[in-house]
Amino acid sequence: MLSRISSVRIGTQVRQLANPVVNQSSQVLQTRQFYVAAALTVGSMIFGKQNKLADSIANGEVHDKTVDYEARHQEALEKRLKTLTDTRPMKPRYEGHIPLNLHEKLLLFVISGIRSYYHPENGVNIVQLGEATALPFILEDLKKTMLSDETGRRILREKPNVRTETLDMDKLSKMPKNTFGYTFYSWLKKEGVSPDTRAPVKYIDDPDHAFIFKRYRQCHDFYHSLNDLPIIIEGEIAVKALEAANMGIPMAALGTLLAPLRLKSAQRQRLYEIYLPWAIRTGLSCKPLINVYWEELLDKDVNELRKELGITPPPDLRKIRKERAALRKKFKMKYESYEKQ
């Protein structure tokens, strides 16, 4: 019995003596592992940089700032750009052209359509939606309309660009007040816009179609000024309806159908009773506006020009709005005076 107790005590003492040794060995092992890991990290940083440097030297990229180096660098850059451009369905066909795949065109239509509905004041949305809905067969039909007319053929051949410098605004300001040129100039000043505010075409693939759509876009303000319609939502809808009836532009038709939904009741009533009937009737009966060389008609009497084109201006929208505002103010004052009694 005594011997068994002694052996247990001896075993316990041995384990107690061995534990510090084991703990010390474990600490030494952990310390060694830490130093080894640190050494490997530092070594990889040093030798990794050396390897990169060696690769650069082997490729002739260090201490070789010669024409050959620049040529190789440019070639590498062009290869990278080529891999990006190869994803396009075609090469750009005119300045500023951005070719899109079919799914990209569909996305452009959906996204720009949603944005245009909720933010019609943002011109970028309207521009993108216009090009997304400008289908090739519609633009080709407009091209045939232009080719069937002598002036239209000349416009296609000469490809005029409606800009401030080409119109000579200073000259327009000095024209007689009955001329179309002065009418256009005074309308621009009244509305605070210029011919340079029209965005270039980007997403239409055919160069002729792109020019036709640009021409339609740049001539938009001529229609405004000829009919003295202001740049407010009612005036824009009226001009869009005129364009849709005359040229069949889908974007113009969409604007005519959807934009009135955001109007107030009085505005919508005015539009449906006066301006939409006028726009549709005038657009269907007047000369194709895409065939009008507006730049050559600036010195013409504005009333004679309207008569030649078959256009009769609508009632003055500014005057109607002003009269309604005055009437509302009168009723408001009358109501307030009645409340004070």
Swiss-Prot record:
The keyword Transferase does not apply. The keyword RNA-binding does not apply. Residues 1-16 form a transit peptide. It is a peripheral membrane protein. Pathway: Cofactor biosynthesis; ubiquinone biosynthesis. Its cofactor is Zn(2+). Belongs to the COQ4 family. Component of a multi-subunit COQ enzyme complex, composed of at least COQ3, COQ4, COQ5, COQ6, COQ7 and COQ9. Lyase that catalyzes the C1-decarboxylation of 4-hydroxy-3-methoxy-5-(all-trans-polyprenyl)benzoic acid into 2-methoxy-6-(all-trans-polyprenyl)phenol during ubiquinone biosynthesis. This is Ubiquinone biosynthesis protein COQ4, mitochondrial. It comes from Vanderwaltozyma polyspora (strain ATCC 22028 / DSM 70294 / BCRC 21397 / CBS 2163 / NBRC 10782 / NRRL Y-8283 / UCD 57-17).
